[in-house]
């Protein structure tokens, strides 16, 4: 599609590789689009091969495609505004940090490793022509109960995965957010020391 609202490249201070420059997080998804097994496997494989401290790989995932019981269960755990639009995505993915090993060893870097895995999944998704929207607005206890998770697995985010659709499918307020200019803090605000 060539609609300007569907291509939202960055206005970065330095050139970036296209997959990073073009990545953005839509809320408007095509509710008729699906994700095949091979594509879903490619996304999860990208997450699997992300860097991991001491190769402990303290990340786990629960994924449900639209129409499945798992998708509906995940969707029911979304809070606030997220619940209004995420059901149109092709899949919902719960990202879990394994904060403790089965033997009780604490993994204080688990959320960092999980974030790297989801970032790799996001880049792979964009390469596959898909878009993600990561959400922290979830009922953590609800996710834990719905999937009978042990205490060592902490639900961190839910990610909507799918094919972007025109923002006219959203309500007026959401559509305005969808088409607003993308912004980030400048480098001098996020880099505290640089010599």
Q: Which stretches of residues belong to each language-model region?
A:
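Acidic, surface-exposed loops and disordered segments
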Residues: 1-195
